[in-house]
A protein has these predicted regions:
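Solvent-exposed, charged interface segments at domain starts and junctions
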Residues: 1-2, 144
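Short, extreme N-terminal segment that most often corresponds to the first beta-strand
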Residues: 2-27
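Compositionally biased amphipathic helical and low-complexity segments enriched in hydrophobic
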Residues: 4, 8, 17, 32, ...
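Short, flexible N-terminal segments of the mature chain
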Residues: 22-57
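Low-complexity intrinsically disordered segments
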Residues: 46-144
């Protein structure tokens, strides 16, 4: 199956966040695969405007909804199918591409609650959007 059209111009990895939650998705399959028990909550929260997303290319997206999509991702989708995961891709209300310092500050603010002020300041001081997202991705892996 093909990649959902809403993700064709998104540069991965991406950071998806809302108040009290952040998640780094390394690829479209990681972003669009949801445990069956959580997909309705994710869809409700996105409709209420709680989710934002940032990509490694420096774009900030306001997530409008997570819409069900056909499974994609080649052989990896089989594992998700066996785990009874649901595929849902984000649609966007709007997107913008702020300058790098503003972008990095937004990302720092987004992860402050999860990783603390010191790390948020480190992310905000990143020189490029790619660097900011990679810092969060590394910390996310360590945190588990």
């Amino acid at each position: 199956m093909a990649l959902p059209k809403t993700l064709e111009s998104v540069k991965f990895p991406v950071l998806l966040w809302r108040k009290g939650y952040s998640y780094v998705a390394r690829d479209p399959v990681a972003l669009c695969t949801h445990p069956r028990s959580l997909v309705e909550d994710t869809r409700r929260r996105s409709k209420e405007g709680e989710f934002m997303m940032a990509d490694a290319g420096g774009r900030i997206y306001e997530v409008g909804e997570f819409e069900a999509v056909r499974p994609f991702g080649g052989i990896t989708r089989i594992a998700h199918f066996l785990l009874r995961s649901v595929f849902a891709a984000p649609t966007f209300r709007s997107d913008r591409q702020p300058e790098a310092p503003e972008f990095c500050g937004i990302i720092g603010d987004a992860v402050r609650g999860r990783f603390g002020k010191t790390f948020a300041a480190e992310v905000a001081a990143a020189h490029t959007p790619q660097e900011a997202i990679e810092l969060v991705q590394k910390r996310d892996r360590k945190a588990g």
